[in-house]
Amino acid sequence: MKQKNINKMRIISEKCVIIDKKKLSHNFNEIKKRIGISKIIPVIKGDAYGHGITECFKTLYRCGSRDFYVARLEDAIKLKKQNLKNINVFLLSGTTSKETCDQLSKYQINPIINNLSQLEIINQHPKAIQYILHFDTGMNRLGFKYSEISRIKSLTKTNLIKFIMTHLSSADEKNMIECKYQLNQIKKINSYFKKPLSIANSSGIFLGKSFHQNYVRPGKSLYGINPFFKKSFGLKGVMSIFAPILQTATIAKGQTVGYGKSYKAKKTTKVATIDFGYSDGYLRSGRNKVKVFIDGNACDVIGRISMDLITIDVSNIEDKDLYLGKAVEILGDNQSCEDLAIQTGTNEHEILISLGMNSKKVYI
């Protein structure tokens, strides 16, 4: 990461969360190359996976996208208030009340209808609202069941159904038996409706053409998360994070670091304290496991991760490079969110959302 971008961030905060819009655009275009005539509907829920929903929305709009998925009504309204032309916003949570439907109608937001209760609520609204029907074909989370088709058809007007969707449960594990079963099920279901289809999430996109159908729904892949372990598919990480050194010290063999004395030095060790902690989304499960980087050199995080601070072993770094304010890479070119996920025992989504949420960002 160029020093000028880090310096730019320091006007706002010592911690640097940098979002590269060019890489986001690159990932969009890499996905576009793979899907032929199918259409991309970006998933920008979870504050665009921690990257900032408004800026990511605008960037993807400039890439040519006009349709977007969000999970919360307030996010859908926020996007509609941007007043960009010809956008469709699809609300994954659907509707829970007449009041919600009032907002859907006012802002022309299209809900995902997941069950008969939601369908009845939207049918009772005095103004017609177009929606998407979501069928459960194996996820067992949200969605109509196959057995409910007759009831659904009796409650729906064909012109109000924009398309039919389902969600793959095991695409990231490349469980082709399950994925093909779900694909066949949704095709069978759609034979009753004859509408456009959407089945592929990020991982589903990379399973092959048969899963693309009319619409694909990339989420994590837009932000550079590879759908399958250690396969890049040309995707680039969009988020980089840097934090400054606050202090350095040398401790003797046998001395300990941090709360609970969980780290004991096996030899004389140079330690740097970094202005970053779990209040910034750094997972405490990473203690004595994760690494950070100084000028491309790996340094172990040692001791417990504190609310605002982490301590690192910098014995391998020259003293001249350990000055106050020196930028330490938490996430970036040397360490992907996949690396951090492995080190902390979670998935890449949680890493990005945890680190990105509630942070001030610089967009480049």
Predicted features by range, described:
Residues I11, K15-I19, K23-H26, G36-K188, ...:
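Active-site-proximal beta-alpha core segment in soluble small-molecule metabolic enzymes
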Residues E30:
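Conserved N-terminal alpha-helix of the aminotransferase class I/II PLP-enzyme fold
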Residues K2-D20, S25, D75, T95-T96, ...:
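Active-site anion/phosphate-binding pocket segments in diverse small-molecule metabolic enzymes
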